[in-house]
Regions:
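All-alpha prenyltransferase/terpene-synthase fold signal
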Residues: 1-253
Length: 253
């Protein structure tokens, strides 16, 4: 399911690179990317159908809610591209749907299949919500300040005019002169890519946006681990999830 979302996301974003290699969309075109994504979604349902019959209705309920949430979040993300003003609250709501719900729904399905009760399942869901938020905020930060070894085009969000967490935070803190620099730079199609990235990052730096983003990442990650710690199961059973969280957040510049 995740790869299905990425294939379709690359079409909507006109993304040339995915995981350090040409995207399916860039290499084989939109039609192949659409059909490949559709096939992956169907394959996901085929795998879900193997769940124990007694649990299948609940599993499908969680999966379908998750899938609809991801689609809703993607629509918000696209809407933000043409929206003049996006608040930090609106942005956080969008990434919860687009990213966190995917991680959280997966965690909840695993909990249900593993025999967890409702309280345990809900706690694992919340753990994954916070972890997904931390991951997406870090992804935004690394897009502008990370290294190309991560498989992303550096400054891709800036060049595409996307309203990342860094951008909406900067706009919320900037004075009118700084806002105008950001607006003009984002819209200036004639500006060389390197210069566009440098100008936007200069405003981000002046407003302390990278540090503030790091703070928010740490806050969400700490909340995730605290939620996991509160789960009433032996610690040894929680350690694989801690390892997963650390590996997910292990990407750094």
């Amino acid at each position: 399911f995740h790869n299905f979302t990425l294939l379709h996301d690359d079409i909507m974003d006109n993304a040339a690179v995915r995981r350090g290699k040409p995207s399916v969309y860039a290499r084989w075109g939109g039609n192949v990317a659409i059909l490949s994504g559709d096939a992956m979604l169907i394959s996901a349902y085929r795998l879900l159908a193997q769940a124990p019959p007694a649990l299948l209705p609940r599993i499908l309920e969680v999966f379908n809610t998750m899938a609809l949430g991801v689609c809703e979040g993607q629509q918000y993300d696209m809407d933000f591209e043409s929206k003049q003003k996006v608040s930090v609250v609106e942005y956080m709501s969008m990434i919860e749907l687009k990213t966190s719900v995917l991680v959280a729904g997966s965690a909840m399905m695993g909990a249900i299949l593993g025999g967890a009760d409702e309280e345990q399942s809900r706690r694992l869901y919340q753990f994954a919500i916070e972890l997904g938020m931390a991951f997406q905020l870090q992804d935004d930060l690394l897009d502008s300040y990370g290294g190309e070894e991560l498989g992303k085009t550096i400054g891709g969000d800036i060049l595409e005019g996307k309203k990342s967490y860094l951008m909406v935070t900067a706009m919320s803190r900037a004075d009118e002169e700084q806002r105008e620099v950001l607006r003009h730079t984002y819209k200036d199609a004639a500006l060389a890519p390197a210069e566009k990235i440098a100008r936007v990052r200069a405003v981000f730096d002046a407003l302390d946006v990278p540090r503030l983003t790091e703070q928010q990442i740490s806050l969400r990650f700490d909340r995730a681990l605290a939620t996991l710690d509160g789960l009433n199961v032996p610690d040894a059973r929680k350690e694989p999830l801690r390892e997963y969280a650390r590996s997910l957040m292990g990407r750094r510049k």
